[in-house]
Amino acid sequence: MQMLDLMKERHSVRQYLDKKIDGDVKTKLDTYVASINEESGLSMQIFYNEPNCFNSMLAHYGKFSNVKNYIAIVGKKEEQEKAGYYGEKLVLKCQELGLNTCWVALTHGKVNVQTKPQQKLLILIALGYGTNIGVAHKSKPIKELCKEDAYPEWFMKGMEAVSLAPTAMNQQKFLFEMKNGQVYAKALRGFYSKIDLGIVKYHFEAVTGHEVR
């Protein structure tokens, strides 16, 4: 499946079936996480069949149900953008494997992650087999997500991918532009905007093959 089609299919899911992640899917997921950790220097830690993290008032407030599997992304405070970038890379791999996901910032309970000095839990990703496939989020017009100009077709294809990216509270607090053939993106003020910046950068690069600075 083409990457853009995968992005179109993937939506946030908060309610899950009581179905284990095992067999070939679990093996492929574990292998992929290990490769991302090696590439990124982050510490992504998968928890399977662990219901306690989402058995809290905060999780119920966030409308999560039956979440028993999740990925904790651990890194340094200044690695939030990297967490978003590689986390979204993993999210789309989960989608390819037939799993549903949801980025989770605050609406969860205690997580027993392993951390090294200067590391902290940056964000979680809930995953599993959803009771539904989720719904598409509303997006700002592409012209509001990048500085107006006469951009080439590949840039606009990248912006289509960017418009499909999940962001905290669907705020889309970022701005893209191109100068002298180089694509730039910056985070605007907002909750978890640095993580969001990493997510949208991955969407653009994965579809176009062009680096975003």
Stretches found by the model and what they are:
Residues 1-213:
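Acidic, surface-exposed loops and disordered segments
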